[in-house]
Curated annotation (Swiss-Prot):
Protein location: Nucleus
CDD domains associated with the record: T-box_TBX20-like
GO terms of molecular function: DNA-binding transcription factor activity; RNA polymerase II cis-regulatory region sequence-specific DNA binding
GO biological process: heart development; positive regulation of DNA-templated transcription
One Pfam family cited in the UniProt record for this chain: T-box
Keywords from the named record: Developmental protein, DNA-binding, Nucleus, Transcription, Transcription regulation
Positions of the DNA-binding region: 103-282
Top-rank taxon: Eukaryota
GO cellular component, as recorded: nucleus
The protein, known as: T-box transcription factor TBX20
Length: 440
């Protein structure tokens, strides 16, 4: 019996359209990426730009603060009025140069990144500029603002070690001008000194009330420096349309705002270049909470940076400006005499005795010849007011006089931890079995 194959079932037009043969035959090569989806370096930043009006041939400033004419595709709402487009003859004579340009060039070659936090973070490198061509008898106001480079959001590709476009930019944040706190400057001052914006802080907190510059993370920004000639009748900067000003842009100061460094080379360069970042060489192993805690401790407690600390009961000023007594601790007697003040009164350094410790010194009548073992084994010896260790003989005398008794638990010396750097400090505090006592 001869076998005859059954005819293939006929597919509907809809099913046939999704068949393998149809899909393979109808496939078309993908269009190449357009120039708008690629990252372009910042060519020029416009002095006059607006999102609501088309851009034409407008006057802009190059990296040396000189005006040139070139079109730009940037779309940014200007913070400073753009009239007059061409500066006056007097303002045209002013030139501005970027200090530490070599350092900025190193960061620019790698792709500068700036950390932004809720509380605000200072910039490094710092924008420092110097002016020439100003009138020595006139007064000038120096400002800075930071504007977006484009309308794109970026992401860092670790496998390519480069920044890629991740999509459209987030909605623009409130634009702010930072007026240099030393303004207004006289022309003579500007000729003799440079202007440093070291106190500028960057934040991602949209509700910031401290005057910090608000930025979006993973967006590229361009700082701009403005100089305004202050007129005699000008009382404030509320109306800048009638003022004479000039804007300076430096291409090497373009940066990407981030909440954590993406490029490890940027991290290394900042640590090597920033003298205040030496202690954070191993900070990458710290958690965010630990890093913020260490930074706040270093800022608030000055003795963490110095081996010498005054341990008196001096009055301190509270937040409301009223005088308040410093808080006590586990090492405070019933007469409100702290352990450190009592020890310093019996240490033999009469020139540094606390006034309240004179009564304790007068009641100490024991002999100084018989030393006793240290009362707290395995811990640091007591320190006097200047951080000097107390001798066993002086300690023996103080133990038999009128003063507090030593507790039986460990006494952590936080300032010794912090001398080793923030990472060593947090490791010492993390692995220590000591009873944590408050700072006094």
């Amino acid at each position: 019996m001869e076998y005859t194959p059954s005819p293939k079932p006929q597919l509907s037009s809809r099913a046939n359209a999704f068949s393998i043969a149809a899909l393979m035959s109808s496939g078309t090569p993908k269009d190449k990426e357009t120039q708008e989806s690629t990252i372009k370096p910042l060519e020029q930043f416009v002095e006059k730009s607006s999102c609501s009006q088309p851009l034409g041939d407008i006057s802009i400033v190059d990296s040396h603060g000189e005006f040139t004419n070139s079109p730009s595709s940037l779309c940014t709402e200007p913070l400073i009025p753009t009239t007059p487009v061409i500066p006056s003859e007097e303002m045209a004579k002013i030139s501005c140069s970027l200090e530490t340009k070599e350092l900025w060039d190193k960061f620019h070659d790698l792709g500068t990144e700036m950390i932004i936090t809720k509380s605000g973070r200072r910039m490094f490198p710092t924008i420092r500029v110097s002016f020439s061509g100003v009138d020595a008898d006139a007064k000038y106001i120096v400002l800075m603002d930071i504007v977006p480079v484009d309308n794109k959001r970026y992401r860092y590709a670790y496998h390519r070690s480069s920044w890629l476009v991740a999509g459209k930019a987030d909605p623009p944040l409130p634009a702010r001008l930072y007026v240099h706190p030393d303004s207004p400057f006289t022309g003579e001052q500007l000729l003799k000194q440079m202007v440093s914006f070291e106190k500028v802080k960057l934040t991602n907190n949209e509700l910031d009330q401290h005057g910090h510059i608000i930025l979006n993370s993973m967006h590229k920004y361009q700082p701009r420096v403005h100089i305004i000639k202050k007129k005699d009748h000008t009382a404030s900067l509320l109306n800048l349309k009638s003022e004479e000003f000039r804007t300076f842009i430096f291409q090497e100061t373009v940066f990407t705002a981030v909440t954590a460094y993406q490029n490890q080379l940027i991290t290394k360069l900042k640590i090597d270049s920033n003298p205040f970042a030496k202690g954070f060489r191993d900070s990458s192993r710290l958690t965010d909470i630990e890093r913020e805690s260490v930074e706040s401790l270093i800022q608030k407690h000055s003795y963490a940076r110095s081996p010498i600390r005054t341990y008196g009961d001096e009055d301190v000023l509270g937040e409301d400006g009223q005088t308040m007594q410093s808080r006590g601790s586990a090492f405070t007697t019933s007469e409100n005499l702290s352990l450190s003040s009592w020890v310093s009164s019996t240490s033999g350094f009469s020139g540094f005795q606390h006034p309240q410790s004179l009564t304790a010194l007068g009641t100490s009548t024991a002999s100084l010849a018989t030393p006793i073992p240290h009362p707290i084994q395995g811990t640091l010896p007591p320190y006097s007011r200047l951080g000097m260790p107390i001798t066993p003989s002086a300690l023996a005398s103080s133990m038999q006089g009128s003063g507090p008794t030593f507790p039986s638990f460990h006494m952590p010396r936080y300032h010794h931890y912090f001398q080793q750097g923030p990472y060593a400090a947090i490791q010492g505090l993390r692995h220590s079995s000591a009873v944590m006592t408050p700072f006094v």
